[in-house]
Amino acid sequence: MKRISRYRRHKAAAPLLLFFALLTVGATFSVASATTSAETTSADRSVQIEEGRQIFLKGCSSCHGLNAEGAQIAPSLIGVGAASVDFQVGTGRMPMADMSTQAMRKDPIYNAEETAALAAYVATLAPGPAIPGESELNFERDGSTAEGGELFRNNCAMCHNFAGQGGALTQGKYAPTLMGVEPKHIYEAMVTGPQSMPVFSDKTITPEEKLSIIKWIKSAEKEPNLGGASLGRVGPVTEGLLGWVLGLGMLIGVAVWLAMKAR
């Protein structure tokens, strides 16, 4: 007892007791805050998913089925992931304006919050590609324009043309222009393969290489005539027309000159 009393009268006893008391209170508050925050986040997530389900039932289920299992006119959405929904809905391709051969890009029908809710709901159906975060899309820091140009020419140019302006495909389909497309949507298209586009998994094209492709596309946007003279921008036939007119004109001119010389 005397030893305990002596410790209590020590000069450092009061500061030490105060320190441990504050430490205990702080630790208790941190644990309680973390628990409350986790519960709040979980509740918010549940609300978002339910909102997405209601949007799906009203705007998507007539084509994709009540359980997103798909139908004769629309594919299943099970396993497509949040990235696919964010791309299709965020670019206005879905819902489709009409049942044409290909979904065209247009102004989105749903706002950002509704799109996020719809993506969150579809993501709960089965695992699939997630929406890339801002830290994953820093193409200016992590991408290489030179590497991106080479990758684009090897993997993308045969459909989107070497300047990313788009081009015709078979059966009335087309590869859209990549000019003016958000980096997030370019990335999502590569990992989900919308419509006729193949899926470029991380094993085929790594995340860093995807950022390089995006960086090259963004650099191409700044160059108005990436392929040289625009020839009036009336379509690819202008090059062939110019070749035929100049070529035939020169041949006719040479023929006339030779005929006159023979006389």
Q: PLM features: residue spans?
A:
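Flexible coil segments in periplasmic/lumen-exposed cytochrome c-class electron-transfer proteins
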Residues: 2, 97-166, 172, 183, ...
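Hydrophobic secretory-pathway targeting helix
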Residues: 2-39
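Juxtamembrane/transmembrane-helix boundary motifs in multi-pass membrane proteins
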Residues: 5-13, 46-49, 145-146, 235
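Electrostatic cytochrome c docking/interface patches
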Residues: 30-54, 71, 126-151, 171
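Gly/Gly-Pro-rich "capping" loops immediately C-terminal to redox-active cysteine motifs
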Residues: 48-53, 65-108, 149, 161-203
